[in-house]
């Protein structure tokens, strides 16, 4: 769900660093553009955005965006990144805001070696555009990521049902609640007399009448 998509990022490479670089990628037509998004400072637990930020107004409705830790040397994300569809983000009344939760094994934030993961999501519950960085250790309560805020009176769009083709020979799944007696049976093939019987009756009648008239005329001629 939008606002709850999580990106789990391994932080083993920052064991001796004081910052976590965050990148964002915009995908469109199988082409992806990756640019620096900002840096998480440790132990200050703050986010410093880079000069190049996402311009949501210039993105197409078919684009996708994802953020996380990207390794330039291997051209890969260090962990699976959830994608957000721009079409859903641009219809929301508020500007998306970065929300980072840093997971660690200890309550001491200055022990960088204790940090294990970063959870990233887009937060739409606040008017503020500044990113939120939180720390979560074993004794901390589980954070609740807010969902996307919709305009008053709006309804979530329902997925459209796929149109069923009318091509002959296409197979359809039988509904479990439909009785077999209610299913239409295929029509039986008619015999020759069933198809043309109504036409043969008057023809036979005319043949018989013609034969009787011929016999009667022959009898009159013989007299």
Curated annotation (Swiss-Prot):
Region (Disordered): 149-188
Transmembrane intervals: 191-211
Biased composition range(s): Acidic residues: 176-187
Pfam entry (one): ECM10
A Gene Ontology term for the protein's cellular component: EMC complex
Keywords carried by this UniProt record: Endoplasmic reticulum, Glycoprotein, Membrane, Signal, Transmembrane, Transmembrane helix
Biased composition (Basic and acidic residues): 159-174
BP GO terms, sorted: protein insertion into ER membrane
The keyword Transmembrane is annotated on this UniProt entry: yes
Superkingdom in the source lineage: Eukaryota
Major location category of this protein: endoplasmic reticulum
Localization of this protein: Endoplasmic reticulum membrane
Signal peptide coordinates: 1-17
UniProt-annotated glycosylation sites, renumbered to this chain: 58
Membrane topology category: Single-pass membrane protein
Protein name listed in UniProt: Uncharacterized protein C19D5.02c
């Amino acid at each position: 769900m939008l606002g709850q998509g999580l990106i789990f990022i391994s932080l083993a490479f920052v064991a001796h660093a004081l910052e976590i670089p965050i990148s964002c990628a915009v995908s469109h037509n199988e082409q992806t553009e990756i640019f620096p998004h900002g840096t998480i400072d440790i132990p200050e637990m703050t986010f410093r955005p880079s000069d190049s930020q996402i311009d949501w107004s210039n993105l197409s409705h078919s684009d996708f965006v994802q953020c996380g830790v990207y390794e330039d040397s291997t051209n890969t994300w260090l962990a699976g990144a959830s994608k957000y569809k721009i079409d859903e983000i641009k219809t929301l009344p508020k500007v998306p805001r970065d929300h980072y939760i840093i997971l660690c094994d200890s309550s001491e934030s200055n022990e960088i070696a204790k940090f294990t993961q970063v959870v990233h999501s887009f937060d739409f519950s606040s008017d503020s555009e500044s990113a939120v960085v939180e720390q979560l250790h074993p004794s901390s309560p589980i954070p609740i990521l807010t969902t996307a805020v919709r305009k008053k009176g709006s309804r979530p769009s329902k997925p459209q049902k796929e149109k069923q083709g009318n091509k002959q020979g296409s197979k359809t799944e039988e509904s479990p609640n439909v009785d077999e007696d209610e299913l239409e049976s295929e029509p039986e093939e008619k015999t020759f007399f069933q198809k043309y019987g109504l036409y043969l009756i008057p023809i036979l009648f005319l043949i018989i009448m013609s034969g009787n008239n011929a016999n009667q005329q022959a009898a009159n001629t013989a007299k």
